[in-house]
């Protein structure tokens, strides 16, 4: 659970080293649960960050970075390191921003520069990271989104609980994203598992399922970009909290569902809510996988016989069943605007 103080001395730090969170005001909490692949626990490719004290009294920043590919962990950590370093170094400038256009230019320039750093390495042809960040300056909140992680605001209008999405997922199935990809040498198809993915025209790769990332050099040659989208919102008295999470949360829980869950659980100690939400998401993955496993086992058993070909097929089915048990990393950060809400 993320409620530790952090230091801003990043000199000499490597991207893969985890920075401690700075959450001195005890209003921002986090939880991360590593995923599984073929029923084995993974080291996890998500990273997250919370910066409050180091940015001064009127500014806060928190983010989730969702890595993918063989170097996904390194990608998410490198992105975290670069954003943190820039924001702390530029805090005196950023804290004076009063318009959305200023925030847009700052983060678009930052991500563009970071992408150039990724391109200088040979490690990120097929690996990269998404990002969902929230910057708060006084009573204005800005969501900075790149990929398919998500930010959602929870408000209470009278007795009604309202979920306001503060980001729009960057999926190749989006018409505007698909148009750009097609214009730049890529195509969007559903070759693998019915999920819209990005391929170079007339080729079998890269097969990326998100349309904006850092890294992913091959995919950037066919329309994927590193330009984030920014949404601005003034924080109002009815606004209770904002939650950000990797797609491991949103794949099995809708935005209204997550907001309702947090409202229901925040009556207890708020510092446990991020952990409870992450565990609820993980439990849903487990239930879905149990259902998949049973369905595939039933199908495999109905086709069994004793000949060698069937035995080989049975072994292959077992491999497929294990593959169906993959569980994504789950990372949650929640900022409560008022601890006594």
Predicted regions and their residues:
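PP2C/PPM-type serine/threonine phosphatase catalytic domain
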Residues: 1-341
